[in-house]
Design a protein with these regions (language model features):
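Accessory nucleic acid-recognition modules appended to NTPase machines
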Residues: 1-77
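Short, surface-exposed loop/helix-turn segments at secondary-structure junctions
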Residues: 25, 29, 93-100
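Arginine/glycine-rich "motif VI" loop of SF2 helicases in the C-terminal RecA-like domain
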Residues: 48-51, 98-111
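Short beta-strand/turn micro-motifs composed of small residues
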Residues: 60, 117-119
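Short glycine-/polar-rich loops that comprise or flank the Walker A/P-loop
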Residues: 76-77, 110-114
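Active-site ExK catalytic segment of metal-dependent nucleases
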Residues: 79-89
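Active-site-adjacent loop/helix micro-motif of nuclease/hydrolase catalytic cores
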Residues: 87-97, 127
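Domain-level recognition of nuclease-like catalytic cores that cleave nucleotide substrates
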Residues: 120-142
Length: 142
């Protein structure tokens, strides 16, 4: 695993203001919208995690496999989150989370306790047959 800092927006709305991003502009530029959505979710996860003594990190290994957000609990257990704007990205994100968990276990590491895809456009939270949770951003609560 690599160690390096990842910068997070404290308030993604600041980037929107600087970019003069309107809803129409963001819908027309889904790549930027996705980056801003990821920053928004990371901000919220950090706030929720810190409220119960956990920490938020990013994961990337030397094969450039990554996890958008890692929440490490006080007891050392950790949860892996992929953050995706569109529901069409859920299957790929879940498959990558499962593969990364399997690689970590195969190499003798401590696997995440929870795998979760947080999605911007999903109607309900559910658990996939592979055990990956899918949670809409609107379901995140402290």
């Amino acid at each position: 695993m690599k160690q390096a800092e990842k910068r997070h927006f404290c308030e993604p709305a600041l980037a929107c203001a600087l970019l003069k991003a309107t809803p129409d502009k963001l819908i027309g530029d889904l790549e930027t919208f996705g980056f801003l959505f990821e920053a928004l979710v990371e901000r919220d996860l950090k706030i929720y995690a810190e409220s119960f003594g956990a920490n938020l990190y990013h994961y990337q290994d030397y094969n450039n496999k990554e996890i958008d957000a890692v929440v490490e609990l006080k007891d050392g257990k950790w949860c892996a989150f992929e953050i995706k704007l569109g529901a069409n990205q859920i299957d790929k994100a879940a498959t990558e989370l499962v593969a990364l968990r399997n690689d970590i276990e195969k190499n003798g590491g401590i696997a995440p306790s929870v795998l979760c895809v947080i999605c911007g456009f999903s109607n309900a939270a559910y658990v996939r047959p592979d055990g990956v949770f899918v949670v809409p951003i609107t379901a995140l609560k402290n």
